Amino acid sequence: MARILIVDDSPTETFRFKEILTKHGYEVLDASTGADGVTLAESALPDLILIDVVMPGVNGFQATRQITRAEKTKHIPIIIVSTKDQATDRVWGKRQGARDYLTKPVEEEALIEVIKQYLNAG
Protein backbone atom coordinates (compact mmCIF):
# COMPACT_ATOMS: atom_id res chain seq x y z
CA MET A 1 0.00 0.00 0.00
CA ALA A 2 1.46 3.33 -1.05
CA ARG A 3 1.77 6.06 1.56
CA ILE A 4 0.74 9.59 0.59
CA LEU A 5 1.47 12.74 2.57
CA ILE A 6 -1.08 15.56 2.35
CA VAL A 7 0.25 19.01 3.27
CA ASP A 8 -2.63 21.49 3.47
CA ASP A 9 -3.67 24.00 6.13
CA SER A 10 -7.38 23.52 5.37
CA PRO A 11 -8.98 20.82 7.54
CA THR A 12 -11.81 20.59 5.00
CA GLU A 13 -9.46 19.92 2.08
CA THR A 14 -7.36 17.50 4.12
CA PHE A 15 -10.48 15.56 5.13
CA ARG A 16 -11.68 15.43 1.52
CA PHE A 17 -8.32 14.17 0.22
CA LYS A 18 -8.09 11.61 3.05
CA GLU A 19 -11.53 10.25 2.18
CA ILE A 20 -10.65 9.90 -1.49
CA LEU A 21 -7.24 8.36 -0.90
CA THR A 22 -8.29 5.86 1.75
CA LYS A 23 -11.21 4.79 -0.44
CA HIS A 24 -8.66 3.95 -3.13
CA GLY A 25 -6.48 1.97 -0.72
CA TYR A 26 -3.75 4.47 0.10
CA GLU A 27 -2.26 5.03 3.53
CA VAL A 28 -2.50 8.74 4.37
CA LEU A 29 -0.36 11.02 6.50
CA ASP A 30 -1.05 14.72 6.89
CA ALA A 31 0.57 17.95 7.95
CA SER A 32 -1.08 21.36 8.26
CA THR A 33 1.98 23.55 7.62
CA GLY A 34 4.78 23.55 5.10
CA ALA A 35 7.39 23.20 7.85
CA ASP A 36 5.60 20.19 9.35
CA GLY A 37 5.28 18.73 5.85
CA VAL A 38 9.04 18.93 5.32
CA THR A 39 9.69 17.31 8.70
CA LEU A 40 7.17 14.53 8.09
CA ALA A 41 8.50 13.90 4.58
CA GLU A 42 11.99 13.40 6.05
CA SER A 43 10.86 11.11 8.86
CA ALA A 44 8.11 9.06 7.15
CA LEU A 45 9.47 9.01 3.58
CA PRO A 46 6.07 8.82 1.86
CA ASP A 47 5.71 7.46 -1.67
CA LEU A 48 4.11 10.70 -2.91
CA ILE A 49 3.23 14.15 -1.56
CA LEU A 50 0.17 16.30 -2.31
CA ILE A 51 0.86 19.88 -1.23
CA ASP A 52 -1.07 23.14 -1.20
CA VAL A 53 0.67 26.42 -1.99
CA VAL A 54 -0.99 28.96 0.30
CA MET A 55 -0.10 28.13 3.90
CA PRO A 56 1.18 30.24 6.79
CA GLY A 57 4.92 30.32 7.36
CA VAL A 58 6.65 28.00 4.92
CA ASN A 59 4.43 27.94 1.83
CA GLY A 60 4.00 25.02 -0.54
CA PHE A 61 6.57 26.31 -3.04
CA GLN A 62 9.19 26.68 -0.30
CA ALA A 63 8.40 23.27 1.19
CA THR A 64 8.55 21.65 -2.25
CA ARG A 65 11.95 23.18 -2.85
CA GLN A 66 13.27 21.97 0.52
CA ILE A 67 11.97 18.44 -0.01
CA THR A 68 13.25 18.12 -3.58
CA ARG A 69 16.68 19.52 -2.69
CA ALA A 70 17.27 17.20 0.28
CA GLU A 71 19.19 14.02 -0.50
CA LYS A 72 16.90 11.87 1.65
CA THR A 73 13.64 13.07 0.04
CA LYS A 74 14.52 14.27 -3.46
CA HIS A 75 13.12 11.08 -5.04
CA ILE A 76 9.58 11.63 -3.69
CA PRO A 77 7.18 12.89 -6.36
CA ILE A 78 5.35 16.05 -5.32
CA ILE A 79 2.05 17.16 -6.81
CA ILE A 80 0.95 20.68 -6.02
CA VAL A 81 -2.82 20.98 -5.54
CA SER A 82 -3.82 24.63 -5.22
CA THR A 83 -6.46 27.24 -5.97
CA LYS A 84 -3.69 29.36 -7.51
CA ASP A 85 -4.23 28.73 -11.20
CA GLN A 86 -2.04 31.19 -13.05
CA ALA A 87 0.49 29.87 -15.57
CA THR A 88 3.24 31.58 -13.58
CA ASP A 89 2.24 29.56 -10.48
CA ARG A 90 2.45 26.31 -12.44
CA VAL A 91 5.85 27.22 -13.87
CA TRP A 92 7.17 28.30 -10.46
CA GLY A 93 5.90 25.09 -8.87
CA LYS A 94 7.72 22.98 -11.45
CA ARG A 95 10.88 25.04 -10.98
CA GLN A 96 10.75 24.24 -7.26
CA GLY A 97 10.70 20.53 -8.09
CA ALA A 98 7.01 19.59 -8.27
CA ARG A 99 6.25 16.88 -10.82
CA ASP A 100 2.73 18.12 -11.48
CA TYR A 101 0.30 20.91 -10.61
CA LEU A 102 -3.45 20.44 -10.20
CA THR A 103 -5.96 23.21 -9.62
CA LYS A 104 -8.57 22.94 -6.86
CA PRO A 105 -11.23 21.81 -6.89
CA VAL A 106 -9.82 18.68 -8.48
CA GLU A 107 -12.09 15.83 -9.51
CA GLU A 108 -11.53 12.53 -7.72
CA GLU A 109 -10.88 10.59 -10.92
CA ALA A 110 -8.32 13.11 -12.16
CA LEU A 111 -6.52 13.12 -8.81
CA ILE A 112 -6.30 9.33 -8.63
CA GLU A 113 -5.15 9.09 -12.25
CA VAL A 114 -2.29 11.54 -11.65
CA ILE A 115 -1.30 9.79 -8.42
CA LYS A 116 -1.19 6.40 -10.16
CA GLN A 117 0.88 7.88 -12.97
CA TYR A 118 3.61 9.02 -10.59
CA LEU A 119 3.51 6.01 -8.30
CA ASN A 120 3.83 3.65 -11.27
CA ALA A 121 6.66 5.71 -12.73
CA GLY A 122 8.80 5.08 -9.64
Regions found by a protein language model. Name each.
Residues 55:
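Receiver (REC) domain active-site loop signature in two-component systems and cognate sites
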Residues 44-50:
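Active-site beta3 strand of CheY-like receiver
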Residues 106-115:
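C-terminal output helix
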Residues 99:
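Short, glycine/charged-rich "phosphate-handling" switch motifs in NTP-dependent
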Residues 15-23:
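Charged docking surfaces used in two-component/phosphorelay signaling
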Residues 25-32, 40:
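Short hydrophobic/Thr-rich beta-strand motif most characteristic of the beta2 strand and flanking loop
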